[in-house]
Amino acid sequence: KILYGNGFNEIIAFESEDINKRDNFFGFWLTDWMRPFENIIEKKWYKWTIGNKNLDITHTSLDKPYCVISFKTWKKFCLETKNNLEIVNKQVVQYFPEQNYFKIITTDNKIYYAQNIYDSRSTKEKKGELLQHFFGINITVADNTFNENKLTLMHFTEEKNVLHFIYILPFSHNKALVESTVFSKDVFHSSWYRQRINDYLKRNNINTFKEQSSEKGVIPMFFAEEKRSVNSNIFNIGIRGGACKPSTGYAFSFLIKQIQLLKSSKKNYVNIHNFLERKMDKVFINFLKNNREDGKSFIKLASNLNGNEFQSFMMGESNLLTKLKIINSMPKLPFIKELFK
């Protein structure tokens, strides 16, 4: 959905959705490559929790906090800093080389030309693969309900045949995004997630709230990159370019890293995740696919790592010692079985 054409020193971004109605949040830890955007971060949390009804593990990172940027803020930033950027609310039907340019045709049969194509369209679904899917609501509640200095990264709840957790971003003492997230092969109706959110809020004595907005999404928990193009002027980016880290679902910050690396590369692709990170992700995801998991493995993992180590794991920057701690945290026999498959 992102196509760049610099033939006339312009950038055109094609987006099939009405982006004026969109206002979701991008979450990430503050890595070095995200620091150039620090001034548009909505909020930072230096503490987060991972747990269930019996146990909470609290992590702290003073130099690499968890951050969010809203889509509206990001769009405004892009439009203000890139004077030659135009966003076109159309879907691209096809594009193909024509002489020294690419000919781009949209659903209304309009034609555009570009020297380079940056393609971030959704990848093909793979049956039987795990998905991370979620639905969240932004709510306003009574004063002093939330601890705005600590986010709930994962609060696991018991659900039949799926891994489920609640994720909460407290923007203030009375405003928060509360999200229901599932790891499974099938996506559910919005009412399923709403019920889990309501149940969680009631268990925490939040019986009255005002819903301001909602958001939902689906992220593949498999390596979903498309085959690299033989044309050096076609760049697959985002999930279709292998930017997403499947085991964690983080994509936005890795897309930024991907673009930064492509700018300095002479090739039309870059490897965002190294061989060992990809191997560990594959083993971890296969473990989740083939074993009943209720979140206890995640809690054990969190208990064996400090905040900076956990952050490095989630953002694909863990060193060898942290990787060994991660492996040691996993159930030994099932994990070893997946390792040698």
Language model regions located:
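Active-site flanking residues adjacent to catalytic metal/cofactor-binding acidic residues
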Residues: 14-15, 118, 237-238
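C-terminal helical "tail/cap" subdomain of flavin- and related membrane-associated enzymes
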Residues: 260-341
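N-terminal FAD cofactor-binding segment of flavoenzymes
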Residues: 2-54
